[in-house]
């Protein structure tokens, strides 16, 4: 049985034993190395990251319906499970994405996150307005079982019925690209939604007389996706969200788009022109288009903002996995053998090794 030994797990010397691509058991203390074993070199072991909202990278995009190269990029950068996330697009394009092979080398792909197309025109952000349409549960059925998470604006006609039906199918429903009032968002959560999509972005903010979707999520115990790059949400506000919701309800996401990991220039993202300049991706009118740093870098930035490392890791592993109903993000017997080895000797954590499916990947 292969093992990963000489690691720190929750601060204690530990050994993880693998059977196939799963953890068989975890033992206290280090063990002698045998051929094929992995030497953790005294580094800290944490679960592989879980990104439940990521569109593209390297000039590629989920809408291309080819995930192989992107999955390798994710894994090399510490994300071992991810949900390729669609743009708001026409039904035939979404069907093509949901039919694309997901059994590829690299990060695990348990399903697709549909960001739209049932969103508010007033909060479309970088989504293509020509593809926005009213809720249609038959369309969602046509995209199952690949579609396992969906973003919707709860104030749209028919949205609550859609949310109930989606939740009954086991789909994780998240409210986003919405102009909903507090009351409308509460109704969405009561109908079965359980998250906010990229909290603060493409939705009303918190006002002392209009708490809006964020106030509703806080009241209803929902999860809150957060792009923690310091650009989409100011660091003090990101820290405020963490303190208000806690690490068990804030799910860090990359929201990576096509230009992530690619040179500066112009890109087509879901039919929208996006310009990457000085590390920021925007539409020609200045609208923020998406994030270009990895989820691991979001973890590092969360730590730099004042979030304890253990909480930052939880917000990028167990919490997003729970938000999207995924078997990932936890190191325990029977769970995926996806492990990051991290050096905590400096001011910020450094990723040293990625173990994916029980083998060293990067």
PLM feature segments, named:
Residues 1-32, 355, 359-360:
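N-terminal metal-binding scaffold of metallo-dependent hydrolase/deaminase domains
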Residues 3, 44, 48-50, 174, ...:
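Residue-level marker for buried hydrophobic side chains located in beta-strands
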Residues 55-57, 68-96, 108-120, 145-155, ...:
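Divalent metal-dependent hydrolysis catalytic cores, especially in the metallo-beta-lactamase
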Residues 72-83, 121-146, 187-199, 210-223, ...:
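Active-site gating loops and adjacent loop-to-helix segments of metal-dependent hydrolytic enzymes
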Residues 114, 166, 196, 302, ...:
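Conserved, mostly hydrophobic/aromatic
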Residues 143-262:
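Active-site core of metal-dependent hydrolases
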Residues 216-225, 242-254, 259-342:
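His/Asp/Glu-enriched, well-ordered alpha-helical/loop segment
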């Amino acid at each position: 049985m292969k093992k990963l030994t000489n690691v720190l797990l929750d601060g204690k010397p530990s050994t993880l034993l693998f059977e196939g691509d799963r953890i068989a058991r975890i033992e206290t203390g280090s063990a002698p190395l045998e051929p094929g074993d992995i030497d953790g070199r005294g580094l800290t072991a944490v679960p592989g990251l879980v990104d439940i909202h990521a569109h593209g990278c390297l000039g590629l995009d989920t809408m291309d319906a080819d995930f192989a190269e992107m999955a390798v990029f994710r894994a090399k950068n510490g994300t071992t499970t991810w949900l390729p996330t669609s743009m708001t697009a026409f039904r035939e394009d979404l069907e093509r994405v949901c039919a694309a092979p997901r059994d590829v080398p690299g990060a695990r792909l348990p399903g697709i996150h549909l960001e739209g197309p049932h969103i508010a025109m007033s909060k479309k952000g970088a989504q293509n307005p020509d593809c926005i349409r009213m809720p249609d549960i038959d369309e969602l059925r046509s995209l199952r079982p690949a579609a396992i998470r969906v973003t919707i604006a709860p104030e749209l006609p028919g949205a609550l019925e859609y949310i109930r039906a989606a939740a009954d199918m086991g789909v994780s429903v998240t409210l986003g690209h919405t102009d909903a009032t507090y009351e409308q968002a509460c109704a969405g959560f009561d109908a079965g939604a359980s998250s906010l999509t990229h909290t603060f972005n493409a939705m009303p903010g918190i006002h002392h007389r209009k708490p809006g979707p964020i106030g509703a999520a806080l009241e209803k115990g929902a999860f809150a996706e957060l792009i923690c790059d310091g650009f989409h949400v100011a660091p003090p506000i990101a820290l405020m969200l963490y303190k208000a919701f806690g690490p068990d309800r804030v799910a860090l996401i990359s929201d990576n788009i096509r230009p992530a990991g690619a040179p500066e220039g112009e890109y087509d993202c879901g039919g929208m022109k996006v310009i990457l300049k000085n590390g920021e991706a925007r539409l020609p009118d200045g609208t923020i288009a998406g994030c270009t740093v990895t989820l691991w870098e979001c973890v590092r930035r969360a730590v730099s903002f004042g979030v304890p490392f253990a909480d930052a890791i939880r917000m990028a592993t167990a919490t997003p996995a729970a938000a999207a109903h995924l078997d990932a993000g936890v190191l325990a017997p029977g769970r995926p053998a996806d492990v990051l080895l991290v050096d905590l000797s400096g001011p910020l954590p450094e990723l040293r090794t990625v173990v994916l499916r029980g083998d060293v990947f990067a």
